[in-house]
Amino acid sequence: MGQKINPFGYRLGITENHRSKWFSDSNKAGERYRDFVLEDDQIRKEMSKDLERAGVSRIVIERTRDRVRVDIHTARPGIVIGRRGAEAERVRAKLEKLTGKQVQLNIFEVKNAALDAQLVAQGIAEQLTNRVTFRRAMRKAQQDAMRAGAKGIRIKLSGRLGGAEISRSEFYREGRVPLQTLRALIDYGFFEAKTTYGRIGVKVWIYKGDMTESEFEEQQAQQNNRPGRRGGDRRPRRGNRSAAPQAAEAPKAEAPAEAAPAAETKE
């Protein structure tokens, strides 16, 4: 399964967090769960389309009762902000018109674009659009990621590579990319290059190392201790083997001690 499923969804709740942070159990039109899911999808599509040149890595959406918070992680924050914040105001006004609520727009800079899989995929797609040979684009992205500190990278291109009449797929890989290890910190990105021969799909996996034991246990404890869940019953089972005999021995030692004084007072 690790070879086929999206690495982000496969590790959701383990090493990855949700990118839509809200809850809805309302039956009112416009506030239902499906309405918010559709609205989140529209927000991401509009932002990816309008800010395509800005190199948007990911968009995180949080909702309150009367406000929507949108966090944009980008490699070029200057393009998103614009001159004197004009572009940011335009984006905010567009989102407020789409959602009908007050929008709080936050812009974060991605400092190391060579280790961001989505930005790497976009970079390769831009080079393919500019008619750079696909092998050269893949090799350059691979070298930049390894120099930036990645422990492994895997790149896949699918389509009419080099203008060939028959579409095919090609892989480039360097280092380790353990897709089935849940504690592995793997970033995944996908983008489509629009060329004169058609669209070419670009997929990128970047392995950044494993989550440490302390970080993993801390994150699991936070999930197991959520209110309304019984996740905390799993880990203590190992300790219950030694706890059971202690509970059985305790009454045997205490029962005679309590019975002896009671008999003496009656006499």
UniProtKB/Swiss-Prot annotation:
It comes from the Bacteria. This is Small ribosomal subunit protein uS3. Residues 43-111 form the KH type-2 domain. Part of the 30S ribosomal subunit. Forms a tight complex with proteins S10 and S14. GO terms for cellular component: cytosolic small ribosomal subunit. One of its GO terms (biological process) is translation. SUPFAM superfamilies: Prokaryotic type KH domain (KH-domain type II), Ribosomal protein S3 C-terminal domain. Keywords: Ribonucleoprotein, Ribosomal protein, RNA-binding, rRNA-binding. Residues 216-267 are annotated as: Disordered. Belongs to the universal ribosomal protein uS3 family. Residues 241-267 have a biased composition (Low complexity). GO terms for molecular function: mRNA binding; rRNA binding; structural constituent of ribosome. NCBIfam families: rpsC_bact. Binds the lower part of the 30S subunit head. Binds mRNA in the 70S ribosome, positioning it for translation. PANTHER family: 30S/40S RIBOSOMAL PROTEIN S3, SMALL RIBOSOMAL SUBUNIT PROTEIN US3C. InterPro entries: KH_dom, KH_dom-like_a/b, KH_dom_type_2, KH_sf_prok-type, Ribosomal_S3_C_sf, Ribosomal_uS3_bac-typ, Ribosomal_uS3_C, Ribosomal_uS3_CS.
